[in-house]
Amino acid sequence: MNKINLKNFYLNLVIILVVFIFDRTTKLYILKLAEVETSVDIYITPFLNLFLIWNKGIAFGLFSIDGSVIYNSITILIGLIIIAIIFMMLKNDNIQRYFFALIAGGAFGNFYDRIVYTAVPDFIDLHFYGFHWFVFNVADIFITIGVFCLILVELFFNNKKTNEKN
């Protein structure tokens, strides 16, 4: 690795660690509250509550099942996806590598929970006039931001490069 690639590698590693640590800190705080309270349902604003649920599925509780074979298969698949994301991050030489680092940091946070707790603690409850969005966590926020930014880069910047070549 040359100096620039090594610097980028360390910067990506820092991004992943910061996201992971921030996610773990928020989850540990909520879990500490759950030890004291019988249930965690904290009113913050008219549109935001902290409400702890345990997600055994994947994003937004999809495929939430109790079968250990299916659960283990999904967990292994998620681990392989994380490896693929890190590979894409390392192979990228542009701004996209930082978005892959955001996704990897969030994915590591949720993967850690799946391994340690066999479920992911979700606790951010956004709602508006009775409509509740899926309950999620900080890792999900960083994954979403990373994916959204990758889509924007692909739509607006990579598309321009393709048009300029033609």
From Swiss-Prot:
Any one GO molecular-function label of the UniProt entry: aspartic-type endopeptidase activity
Entry's Gene Ontology BP terms: proteolysis
Q: In which pathway does it act?
A: Protein modification; lipoprotein biosynthesis (signal peptide cleavage)
Q: Which InterPro entries match?
A: Peptidase_A8 (IPR001872)
**What is the enzyme's main class?**
hydrolase
Main localization of the protein?
Answer: membrane
Q: What membrane topology is given? A: Multi-pass membrane protein
Q: Where are the transmembrane segments?
A: 11-31, 42-62, 69-89, 99-119, 133-153
- Catalyzed chemical reaction(s): Release of signal peptides from bacterial membrane prolipoproteins. Hydrolyzes -Xaa-Yaa-Zaa-|-(S,diacylglyceryl)Cys-, in which Xaa is hydrophobic (preferably Leu), and Yaa (Ala or Ser) and Zaa (Gly or Ala) have small, neutral side chains
**Active site feature:** D122, D140
Sorted keywords for this record are:
Aspartyl protease, Cell inner membrane, Cell membrane, Hydrolase, Membrane, Protease, Transmembrane, Transmembrane helix
Query: Where is the protein situated, by its record's location annotation?
Result: Cell inner membrane
Q: Name one Pfam family in it.
A: Peptidase_A8
- Known EC number(s)? 3.4.23.36
Role, per record: This protein specifically catalyzes the removal of signal peptides from prolipoproteins.
- Tell me the protein family, please: Belongs to the peptidase A8 family.
Which protein are we looking at? Lipoprotein signal peptidase
Q: Which organism is it from?
A: Pelagibacter ubique (strain HTCC1062)
Its taxonomic path starts at: Bacteria, Pseudomonadati, Pseudomonadota, Alphaproteobacteria, Candidatus Pelagibacterales
